[in-house]
Amino acid sequence: MSYRLTNPRIISTLGACSMLIVGLGFPAEGATTPSSTTKSSGSSVPGGSTPGSGNGSSITPNQCTYRSVNITGAKKTQGLPGQYTSGYSKKQNKLYVSSAESGAAESTNISTLARVNPETLQIEATAKIPVVPDTENKTPNLKQFRAPLGITVDDEHDLIWVTDGLTYSVSAYDINTLQQVWTSYDPNKKRNQQTIQHPREIKIDPVTGKLFVTGTGMYSIDPKTKEIKSLDYPKGVYDSFGMHTALNSADRELYVTDWGTDEVLVFDADTFTHKRSLKVTGAEQTGVPTQPHGIAYDNSLGKLYISVQGSNGINSGIYELDKNTGHVKDYVKHGYLSGALAHDEERDLLYIADYGESKQISKDAGNVAVFDTRQNKVVKDVRVSPSEVNFLTIQGDGSVVAVSRDKTYKNTNVDFRIDPTTGEYQSASVDEYPGKESVNITANTLSRFKAEDAGTAPGETKRIIDPASAPEQTRLVSDNTSEAATVSAPKTVYAGQKFTIGGSDWTYGEDYLPSDITVTLDDGKSKVNGQGEMTFKLSEEETSFTRDIEVPADWKPGEEHNVTISSGKTKGDKQRSLTIKFKVEEYNPKYIDSCTVPAQDAVQATEVPFAGYPKVGDNAS
């Protein structure tokens, strides 16, 4: 069922403006609800579940088991200011971490590329990064770093390839000296004129050796000729922003998550032509943005996985998608903002981090989930930092390194900083920038752990609503135009239950201020707790939301009723109004047994002493 509001508006970059009214059933007393009603035969509760078949089906204790892992060597320590990503060299048995900190201004004047001991996490060397004019700043003659963000290690050629999201370039560093040996950066061009726009991730195709770079669009680089090609990105894509890639070796397909369009784009890895786009629909709320982030393709199992950030905690989690249609085959809720993802294909394990946000309360923030791809279950959580885990890397021994941006370590003194007025290196614990307020330099958490197989363990059998018979939560209705405000709704609500109002980007004005949402039932004639009209005030951070509303007690099966959703009561707000009719039906769900992973506390990483930073440019060989 699809509707369009009478007054269209411009969509913000975070997602399509939408409003949802969704049917939400609640179970009988003593039963357990799934965390979503995605039409999946697999897991649908936190941690993953394996449902039985048919109404009243039972699972024996011998059938209800899950893969058990032990977490060893979980440690954390002080890392780098502004650290972003990392890469592992099997040949060198070393970890490399990028750092790009804006500090007191938008330009970067704190930056390095660090070599790190993969076991102790001791920082062994920090590189001197090239300094260039800050052409984007209005103040003349200022300097900035060409700061590393994305990293991939090229052991065959003893190189570290890095992306720079500030000068929009890709560079190669000698892995032994940590000195730049090539760059795509053209000093005669401004940032928006560079060949590669907004580069982020960089990866090597193990078959051809060519490099894939995500950004605003998609690019390939021939490491021998240094030729840069733009992949056949879909024309007219709105707010595209490529994030991460995965390669299907058998089909030679490259999968790319696009955070801006809520899609996974599929390219021919050899011809670079666009083959299809997979729309990623929210497993909890279809009208709320999914914002796909990490991605992995398990070639041995033939499974395509993505991590989804969602919006304000909605839709966040681990998705298994049909590689041809994008249909959500399975969904496991995890965290407030699922982001960084690493894939150990040999062991059939995924590692997914909850980025969380320092301003938001999320019990899983800073957690990394250990996810078994054989059963689609989260089998363990490891808390590696207070929040904002940005990147995960699997090392040669199977251990996982987590790079966070949590700013835990205050008043950090570094010598990989430049004076922006001179471009000269200068040791400091306070960052200063002309015309800006000075800020203390803070460092982030660097952590490591290893998940070791420990056989199987008994799970817990719970009664859940059969996902196949549960009320459908939403109906996708967006027509994907840049100015259309759309609404989705169920055709039915259920007597004695609740329905959920959800939405995304209900804002007004150039500053995208949050609207106040007003809901009335039967033009105010039907009441809930004596109220015929309900107004929801959204916070500034609440770009997406859900609100539960009880079905009025006098609504009986077989009747038709309506709900009106509107905004515009706040001064300056845009006036929008829509009335939706639906039927009331009796709620009679089916229940099945489900095998779940027992609740368990996250393993805590232990703090280890920080060994300090070596002098910048030393110990690089």
Predicted regions and their residues:
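Aromatic/hydrophobic beta-strand junction motif of beta-rich domains
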Residues: 501-505, 620
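Short beta-strand segments of immunoglobulin-like
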Residues: 488-493
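Predominantly soluble domains enriched in secretory-pathway, periplasmic, or organellar proteins
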Residues: 31-477, 597, 617
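Short, surface-exposed loop/turn segments at beta-strand-coil junctions that are enriched for proline
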Residues: 550-556
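Secretory targeting and sorting signals
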Residues: 1-32, 621
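Exposed beta-strand face motif in extracellular beta-rich ectodomains
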Residues: 557-563
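Extracellular Ser/Thr-rich, low-complexity/disordered mucin-like segments
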Residues: 603-621
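Aromatic sugar-binding surface patches on proteins
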Residues: 539-548
